[in-house]
Swiss-Prot record:
It comes from Frankia alni (strain DSM 45986 / CECT 9034 / ACN14a). It is a multi-pass membrane protein. F-type ATPases have 2 components, CF(1) - the catalytic core - and CF(0) - the membrane proton channel. CF(1) has five subunits: alpha(3), beta(3), gamma(1), delta(1), epsilon(1). CF(0) has three main subunits: a(1), b(2) and c(9-12). The alpha and beta chains form an alternating ring which encloses part of the gamma chain. CF(1) is attached to CF(0) by a central stalk formed by the gamma and epsilon chains, while a peripheral stalk is formed by the delta and b chains. It holds the Pfam family ATP-synt_A. One of its GO terms (molecular function) is proton-transporting ATP synthase activity, rotational mechanism. This is ATP synthase subunit a. One of its GO terms (cellular component) is plasma membrane. Disulfide bonds: none annotated. It is found in: Cell membrane. PROSITE patterns: ATPASE_A. Keywords: ATP synthesis, Cell membrane, CF(0), Hydrogen ion transport, Ion transport, Membrane, Transmembrane, Transmembrane helix, Transport.
Length: 289
């Protein structure tokens, strides 16, 4: 579709956001053999988000003090949140080693998303599918690495191929391909699509109401223009919440995938052991059976 159009106003000359909003023009192109390198707004904002996150954490931790203030306080608060609520909260104590990656992932996605409502930028870098796909591939490599490191390559891939060795053969033949497909393809694919679709749709919705307000305000009755403007303002605030929520979701899903990969090979707890674990101190598990 060449142009996104609001049908109600199309006959009056109003056109919604065009595809150029997301397919930003190239600022310059450089050809190196068969490789064509270019820079556009989307690429520039992606680079800016990465540099911004790196500089903020460098400033926060380069001269760390016992009593944190300013940027150091912000960085330590972000680290504690990701470490306690996501890394250790989802994976467990062994998740602490993955806190740096989860922190960088959360911070980069958050900054990239928030660029959608920053004047002059007004474009979420994550609304281009390439960015979420790269993040998903890195996460895919990370949880495969975590599974191999925790269980060994042989045990990890063996359980992926045969996740239920005690089940009947027909079930095993069914579960094996499903587990392989889920781990190697579905997880990174859905991780990328979820982030891309939310940011694309949110930015598109903001543009429709913002352009609608710009089109309707000079035209009587002015109530429609004012209403469109108010909706655009409310959606901007709502978009900020969605930006933070999407950063949190992709980070916690990454932690869940890493934790699941590390848990491969662990057998279910026997009922008696589970009862003993949750029984009050001094009371035998058998008393609760």
């Amino acid at each position: 579709m060449e142009v996104f159009v609001v049908p109600v106003l199309a006959d009056e000359g109003f056109e919604g956001p065009t595809k150029e909003v997301f397919q930003t023009p190239h600022w310059f192109d450089v050809g190196i053999g068969s490789v064509n390198l270019y820079l556009n707004k989307a690429t520039a904002l992606t680079i800016f988000a990465a540099l911004f996150v790196g500089v903020i954490f460098w400033l926060g931790f380069r001269r760390a003090k016992i009593i944190p203030r300013g940027i150091q306080n912000l960085c330590e608060s972000a680290y504690d949140f990701v470490d306690l609520q996501i890394a250790r909260g989802v994976i467990g104590e062994k998740g602490a080693r993955y806190t740096p990656y989860l922190l960088v992932l959360f911070s980069f996605v958050l900054v990239s998303n928030v660029l959608a409502i920053i004047p002059a930028a007004q474009f979420p870098a994550t609304s281009r599918i390439a960015v979420p796909m790269v993040l998903a591939v890195v996460t895919w490599v990370m949880f495969i690495y975590a599974g191999i490191k925790s269980n060994g390559a042989g045990a990890y891939f063996k359980e992926m191929i045969d996740p239920a060795p005690t089940a009947p053969l027909a079930i095993r033949l069914l579960l094996g391909p499903i587990e392989i497909l889920s781990t190697l393809i579905v997880r990174p694919f859905t991780l990328a699509i979820r982030l891309f679709a939310n940011m694309f749709a949110g930015h598109l919705l903001l543009l429709v109401f913002s352009l609608g307000a710009d089109y309707l305000l000079p035209k009587p009755p002015f109530v429609f223009g004012v209403a469109s403007l108010l909706v655009a303002i409310v959606l901007t605030a709502f978009e900020l919440v969605i930006d933070a929520l999407q950063a949190y979701i992709i980070t916690i899903l990454t932690a869940a995938y890493i934790g699941g990969a590390m848990a491969h090979g662990e057998h279910e707890v026997a009922p008696s052991e589970e009862l003993a674990e949750h029984a009050p101190v001094g009371v035998p598990a058998a008393a609760h059976a």
